[in-house]
């Protein structure tokens, strides 16, 4: 008679009926028997009730230990591998499908924010999730989302960089949560409503911290951007991809203000982000009858999405359907794995899990 033990993966136990009742068969070769509860229970009080109570005690002890560990941990859900297999349907070998929440948990976003080449990519992905995909995440993925966001805010407060970028991210998330919290009873958010109200208060506190940042001058006295030749100053400005950064840089010094109004600088910025067809539809002339490229840029930004470019992105292998960070290895059987990899923008990453 087979008996299934506590571990469902075990082959079970062999029991044999004797004159004294059912006994567990210990060794097939020796033919010896062993009493299941003889080590801690007398034979007279042996019963099914004792067996079930011991099993329930073990399960309860394991559950209490797990609850204590979960209550003490505030870190991100950890997974050893830095890649994930993306499957969208069930097969004989693999059942189910990969979700956005699973990918968000298993990919190394917590470490990625520490890399300046991947920071903007992760922030843009967080913004897209906050806009429309927050309800598609599981409970652990939503908790993971808030933990990563907290690390991003702490990093910005420490480095005093990318302040405006994180302000916009927090405002987007707060606006989305205000809409979702009002829809109580429709199962749009995982968890208690009071927990999400507390998280919204935390977001407001982060916004206050970012607004109160006072950028201090560096202690060392060396060359500044105003001490450089004009050609180098223009070269630095041409590497800025956001027109708002050009405006802010022009407000730092009178000499930089003159350079920030350069028509050729704004023309190249428009041509970098937008196509010729888009530019022709939004032509604006100045009082002198010339194209006002600065006004055209801000007009185009309101009408069309800007070009996105990141140092390091996520990539999908077309051969083995594995998603990983660019530059990291993954188990691939292709002869040339690099030729099979396709870079994904943050929006492409989200679209990958839309079924």
UniProtKB/Swiss-Prot annotation:
Q: Which UniProt keywords apply?
A: Cytoplasm, Nucleus, Ubl conjugation pathway
Motif Nuclear export signal per UniProt: ranges: 169-173
Pathway where this protein functions: Protein modification; protein ubiquitination
Q: What is its main location?
A: cytoplasm
Q: Which GO terms describe its cellular component?
A: cytosol; nucleoplasm; nucleus; SCF ubiquitin ligase complex; Z disc
Q: Where is this motif: Bipartite nuclear localization signal?
A: 280-295
Q: Where's the F-box domain?
A: 223-271
Tissues of expression: Specifically expressed in cardiac and skeletal muscle.
Extent of motif Nuclear localization signal: 62-67
Gene3D superfamilies xrefs = 1.20.1280.50
Output the GO biological process annotations, alphabetical, semicolon-separated.
Answer: cellular response to dexamethasone stimulus; protein ubiquitination; response to denervation involved in regulation of muscle adaptation
Q: Subcellular location, in the record's words?
A: Cytoplasm; Nucleus
Complex formation: Part of the SCF (SKP1-CUL1-F-box) E3 ubiquitin-protein ligase complex SCF(FBXO32) formed of CUL1, SKP1, RBX1 and FBXO32.
Role: Substrate recognition component of a SCF (SKP1-CUL1-F-box protein) E3 ubiquitin-protein ligase complex which mediates the ubiquitination and subsequent proteasomal degradation of target proteins. Probably recognizes and binds to phosphorylated target proteins during skeletal muscle atrophy. Recognizes TERF1.
**Protein name (database record):** F-box only protein 32
Give the organism, scientific name.
Mus musculus
User: Organism classification, top ranks?
Assistant: Eukaryota, Metazoa, Chordata, Craniata, Vertebrata
């Amino acid at each position: 008679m087979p008996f299934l033990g506590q571990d469902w993966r075990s082959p079970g136990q062999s029991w044999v009926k004797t004159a004294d009742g059912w006994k567990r068969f210990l060794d097939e070769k020796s033919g010896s028997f062993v009493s299941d509860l003889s080590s801690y229970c007398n034979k007279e009080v042996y019963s099914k009730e004792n067996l079930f109570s011991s099993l329930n005690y073990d399960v309860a002890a394991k559950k209490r230990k797990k609850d204590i560990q979960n209550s003490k941990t505030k870190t991100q859900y950890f997974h050893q591998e830095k890649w994930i297999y993306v499957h969208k349907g069930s097969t004989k070998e693999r059942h189910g499908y990969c979700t956005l929440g699973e990918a968000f948990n298993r990919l190394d976003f917590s470490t990625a924010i520490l890399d300046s080449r991947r920071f903007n990519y992760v922030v843009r992905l967080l913004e897209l999730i906050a806009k429309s995909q927050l309800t598609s995440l599981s409970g652990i993925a939503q908790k993971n989302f808030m933990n990563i966001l907290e690390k991003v805010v702490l990093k910005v407060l420490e480095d005093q960089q990318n302040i405006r970028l994180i302000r916009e991210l927090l405002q987007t998330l707060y606006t989305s949560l205000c809409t979702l919290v009002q829809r109580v009873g429709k199962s749009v958010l995982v968890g208690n409503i009071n927990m999400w109200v507390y998280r919204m208060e935390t977001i407001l506190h982060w916004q206050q911290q970012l607004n109160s940042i006072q950028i201090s001058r560096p202690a060392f006295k060396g060359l500044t951007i105003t001490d450089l030749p004009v050609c180098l100053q223009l070269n630095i400005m041409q590497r800025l991809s956001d027109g708002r950064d050009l405006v802010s840089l022009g407000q730092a010094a009178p000499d930089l203000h003159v350079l920030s109004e350069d028509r050729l600088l704004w023309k190249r910025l428009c041509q970098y982000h937008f196509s010729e067809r888009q530019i022709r539809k939004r032509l604006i002339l100045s009082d002198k009858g010339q194209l006002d490229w600065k006004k055209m840029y801000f007009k185009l930004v309101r009408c069309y999405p800007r070009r996105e470019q990141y140092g390091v992105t996520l990539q999908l292998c077309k051969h083995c359907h594995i998603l990983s960070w660019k530059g990291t290895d993954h188990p691939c059987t292709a002869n040339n794995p690099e030729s099979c990899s396709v870079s994904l923008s943050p929006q492409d990453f989200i679209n990958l899990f839309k079924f």
